[in-house]
Each structure stands twice: as structure tokens, then as C-alpha cells.
Amino acid sequence: MTVLIHVLGSDIPHHNHTVLRFFNDTLAATSEHAREFMVAGEDNGFTESCPALSLHFYGSKKVLAQAVIAKAKANRRQRFFFHGQFNTSLWLALLSGGIKPAQFYWHIWGADLYEVSHGLKFRLFYPLRRIAQGRVGGVFATRGDLSYFARQHPGVRGELLYFPTRMDPSLNAMAKERQRAGKLTILVGNSGDRSNQHIAALRAVYQQFGDTVNVVVPMGYPANNQAYIDEVRQAGLALFSAENLQILSEKMEFDAYLALLRQCDLGYFIFARQQGIGTLCLLIQADIPCVLNRDNPFWQDMAEQHLPVLFTTDDLNEQVVREAQRQLASVDKSGITFFSPNYLQPWHNALRIAAGEAE
């Protein structure tokens, strides 16, 4: 029997760390198909912190892709589970036959599914990638992303699967301890990545609420982002008074980030695709409603779980926000499909499907 190989094809330390720790701590002991990884980027202590995994690191996305293609050609029974935003060379290999459809299973994280970049090289590449995506052996994704993908590729198998957000189920009831009143605090974006469209989001918040709310913008990740942080700060200060705007430029530890989220009353996410599911889960767990772009299909997942959804096109005010908080507080968090530990069983199923052990 050939063991399934997992591929983290882009050097995205935060996401890669979450996936590797999840597999090491939760899946590796239960399945031999959850232990073998090929990772773009440096070790950064992963080997030491994930002793249950067999990790192989590659200095660039291109070098990793070459290694994957070589393995795929050497053994056509070898199957790969590609996690998230990988790389151009892998799509082209699927398109050219270097990797066969039966070898290629993909967990969609969002970015590689949507065509949002306007650069010429992206616009030229998107049609090729779209054809390649129709050749994958199967996909795993959120309900909204599965729906989006199926409209383009109805013949490809799709299974529900959620990114393994680090969550403590014992915190599901913690929000009840806080009384919410006074000036609203609004979280804008889930990181410092430009995909959050921070400036457009700040303008949208100002248009809805004016300079009457506290605005918190976490921008400590990714690193080496100071020029963009300064740009966002300047745009924010043109709208909000200094005491109402908090731009966080330092990377935060998880517990500190969790504490920050729990001080908020509303999350505001303007991006027109599924991303930031980890932050959304942590906000929902704390009874903090989220404002989504109507083009972000994750609203379908939220609606399926009977969670209130606010949209950027809605007329928002404090009364609307407080009512959404009340509705969230009435939801039994233990039953939410994309919360821990409910997302575990679909992962076990995904491993068996990708490994060829389940129909």
C-alpha cells in the first residue's frame, strides 16, 4: 500500500503551522495517511514540534513542485493531498499530465479558487488554472466554496471539510460572562494581508457608523509589512479620531489575540471570497456577529448552522448589532459543524477518500 503524501505548497508559516500541529496532535495517531508531508519553506522548528510527522522541506515552491512531479511520475499509484494555496507549477503539472487526476486531491482554502487579482500574469494564468481545477480527483471545502466550485466543475467530487481552527470547546459559554453596552468596538480584517482591503473596509465602517465606534485593525501578520501598515493608518486617521482607531502592528500570540477578539462587538470583513475562517469561528464562539461581503460564500455555511449573518450592504447600527449578538447567544455552539471537535470526523473521511480507501 502507498501512503498518502500531504503537500503544503506555499511558504505560509501561520497556516502551515496550524495544519502541521493539527495533524501531529490529532490525526497522526489514528491514520498512517496523516504522517507524510512535503512543505515549501524552512523547517522553523516544525520537525521538533511535530515528532509524529515525517516532514520534508523544500527551499522554494518551484523546487517542491519538481519533487512532487518526480514522485507522481515514478509511481502513478502515489496520491497527494494538496492543502490550500499552493503554486503555479503544480497546476501546470496537472494540466500537462505530469500529475494524473487520480493522484490529485485538493483542500480548497479560498485564495486558489477565486480570480481576484488584476495583474496581467494572473489574468493570463487564471483560464489555465480553471481548466486544471476541473481535472482534480476530488476537492474538500466549505459549503460555500463547494457550491462555487461545482458551478464551474459539476463533474468533480466535492466533500465538506473545514480548516482546523484552533479552538477550545470549553470557551463556548464564556461570552455569557460579558455584558455588552456602550460604544461599539469593531474588528476590521483578520490580518495585515492586503486581501483584507483594509482601507475600503475602514471607509465602509465610517459610512455606516461615523466616528462613533472603536476600530481595531490587526496587522501584525505577515511580517515586513510596515509600508502598507502606514498606508492603512494614514487612511484610518483621515476618517477616525486617534482615540477611536487602533492599528496593531506587532504579531500577537494566540491567547492575546483571543483576548482582543473577545473585547470586540462586531467583525467586519469586506473581502469577496472565503478567507479568515479561523477568526470568524473565534468571533462566533464569543457571540460576536460578523459582517460579510455578499460575494463571500461562507455566509452559506453560517446560514446552514442557523447563525445570523450581516452583510456589508445592510443598514447597520448599534441596535442591529446588539440583536445579532442576542441571536448568536441563543445558538448551541456545540452543534456548529465547523467548530472543534465537530470538524474532526470529516477529516478522517477526507484522508480515506484521498488515500483511495473509501468510495
UniProtKB/Swiss-Prot annotation:
Chain coiled-coil ranges: none
What GO annotations for molecular function exist for this entry? 4-acetamido-4,6-dideoxy-D-galactose transferase activity; fucosyltransferase activity
Keywords carried by this UniProt record: Cell inner membrane, Cell membrane, Glycosyltransferase, Membrane, Transferase
One GO cellular component, as annotated: plasma membrane
Compartments annotated for it: namely: Cell inner membrane
- Name any one Pfam family assigned in the record: Glyco_transf_56
Membrane-protein topology = Peripheral membrane protein
Q: What class of enzyme is it?
A: transferase
Catalytic activities: beta-D-ManNAcA-(1->4)-alpha-D-GlcNAc-di-trans,octa-cis-undecaprenyl diphosphate + dTDP-4-acetamido-4,6-dideoxy-alpha-D-galactose = alpha-D-FucNAc4-(1->4)-beta-D-ManNAcA-(1->4)-D-GlcNAc-undecaprenyl diphosphate + dTDP + H(+)
Q: Which InterPro entries match?
A: WecF (IPR009993)
For this protein, the Enzyme Commission number is: 2.4.1.325
Q: In which pathway does it act?
A: Bacterial outer membrane biogenesis; enterobacterial common antigen biosynthesis
Q: Which family does it belong to?
A: Belongs to the glycosyltransferase 56 family.
Q: Which NCBIfam families match?
A: PRK02797.1-2, PRK02797.1-3
Tell me, in a sentence or two, what this protein's role is. Catalyzes the synthesis of Und-PP-GlcNAc-ManNAcA-Fuc4NAc (Lipid III), the third lipid-linked intermediate involved in ECA synthesis.
Protein name, UniProt field:
TDP-N-acetylfucosamine:lipid II N-acetylfucosaminyltransferase
Annotated source species: Salmonella paratyphi C (strain RKS4594)
Upper classification of the source organism reads: Bacteria, Pseudomonadati, Pseudomonadota, Gammaproteobacteria, Enterobacterales
Tell me the name of the encoding gene: wecF
